[in-house]
Amino acid sequence: RERLQLDADSKVPTEYVSTMYELMHLAFMTDSTRVATYQIASMGDATTLGGKFPQLLGIGKHLHGLAHDWNKAEGAEALGKWDRFLAEQFVTFLDRMRNTPAGPESDATLLDQTTIIYGCSNSTTHTNKNYPLVLAGGRGLGFKHGQYLKYGEDTPFANVFATMLQQTGVTNRFADSTAI
């Protein structure tokens, strides 16, 4: 197994993002935490580390520029390349989780016992309306996957978190959730 490079070069986005995902994997694997969050960048981001990743990858503009050029041919292609980069990094993380046993005497994987929510870019709106999300893992917690769900505009995003918390027995409600 390769050694984790904790001094990942922030000028090499693939190395940097991979290191962050590997740290989360190790934290779950060693039961150092039960919760982790990682935001690479915001679509409104032009100046921070993650906002510059598309440029460093040779995709084009900073992240905020990609968001505003989605309706131009070259902009849509660049945004697609950025989304693909993010998705590939996420899949690598899921594969690590899938290939790690949940425990020494368990047939389940770490992915089976973990619920992961992933959101990707949302173009020019810079809001959480019509936001593409993936809910992965949690098979051992009773989640059923392999489906596409579309909700109305009045459905609070908090319903997703409420469902995740219900499946783990933490609580039935979360923020402005409406589902029970």
Task: List each model region and its residues.
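Ligand-binding pockets and gating/stacking loops
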Residues: 1-180
